[in-house]
């Protein structure tokens, strides 16, 4: 069966049906809007990326997006979330620079620039889902951005790490997958990066293709870059919350895109 935006829209409408929800399929923009009729809050889904995931994962891709939307809508329907008293549940999350900088209510989200490809947003963990922290939440509780930043960084460092190692063509790859929603966020833990940098025999390259994986690679020969690039693209295409297929090199505490450095690296005769 060939999946189209119309077919996908119909499937999602059926799976997400609720007495208080409305759906709006926009054929020109290839989007589906899911909205709570009482609060007028909702989520707009970009359908082509979901179709791409469906071609790889079939029904599993549908299950993932239904779960994500259901949890997010439930959170929206609940009472206003407060940060005070829940400080240990505030974490940084990595998103692409194309990710919206405002909430569905047009409230500016709190974020910091990270790289040319990524931003750091801040989230209040609600268990099965989370709420991105916005400017209104800060003002209501009289929090500063610096307090959010420091609290999130402290909590991130307290998270346990789950790492799997693989060796391909003489290059070593380390996959951080604790499946706690903050695997990609561990790119912000400099202690981890510095430890792997210290023990790397080659260049330390890093990839955050989607929210639920961080890849560190000890690149010991030129083929390692291509292998990491292929891995990153595969993870990027299959992720529920994709970030970037681009990889970075880590040197002197800084991240730089691999393709920029490759262009500037002189070729040997």
UniProtKB/Swiss-Prot annotation:
Transmembrane segments: none annotated. Pfam families: DUF1444. InterPro entries: DUF1444 (IPR010838). Belongs to the UPF0354 family. HAMAP family: UPF0354. This is UPF0354 protein YtpQ. It comes from Bacillus subtilis (strain 168). The gene is ytpQ.
């Amino acid at each position: 069966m060939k999946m189209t935006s119309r077919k996908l829209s119909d499937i999602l409408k059926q799976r997400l049906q609720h007495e208080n929800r409305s759906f709006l399929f926009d054929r020109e923009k290839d989007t589906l809007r899911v909205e709570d009729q009482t609060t007028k809050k909702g989520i707009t889904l970009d359908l082509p990326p979901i179709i791409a995931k469906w071609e790889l994962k079939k029904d599993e891709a549908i299950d993932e997006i239904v779960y994500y939307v259901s949890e997010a809508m439930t959170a929206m329907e609940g009472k206003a979330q407060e940060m005070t008293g829940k400080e240990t549940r505030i974490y940084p999350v990595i998103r692409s620079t194309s990710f919206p900088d405002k909430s569905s209510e047009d409230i500016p989200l709190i974020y910091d620039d990270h790289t040319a490809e990524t931003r750091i947003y801040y989230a209040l963990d609600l268990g099965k889902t989370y709420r991105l922290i916005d400017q209104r939440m800060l003002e209501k509780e009289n929090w500063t951005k610096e307090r959010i930043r420091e609290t999130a960084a402290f909590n991130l460092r307290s998270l346990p790490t789950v790492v799997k190692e693989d060796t391909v063509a003489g290059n070593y790859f380390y996959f951080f997958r604790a499946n706690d929603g903050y695997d990609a966020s561990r790119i912000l833990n400099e202690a981890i990066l510095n430890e792997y940098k210290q023990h790397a025999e080659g260049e330390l390259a890093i990839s955050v293709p989607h929210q639920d994986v961080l890849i560190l690679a000890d690149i010991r020969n030129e083929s390692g870059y291509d292998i990491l690039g292929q891995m990153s693209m595969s993870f990027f295409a299959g992720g529920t919350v994709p970030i970037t297929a681009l990889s970075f090199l880590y040197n002197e505490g800084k991240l730089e895109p691999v393709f920029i450095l490759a262009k500037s690296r002189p070729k040997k005769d």
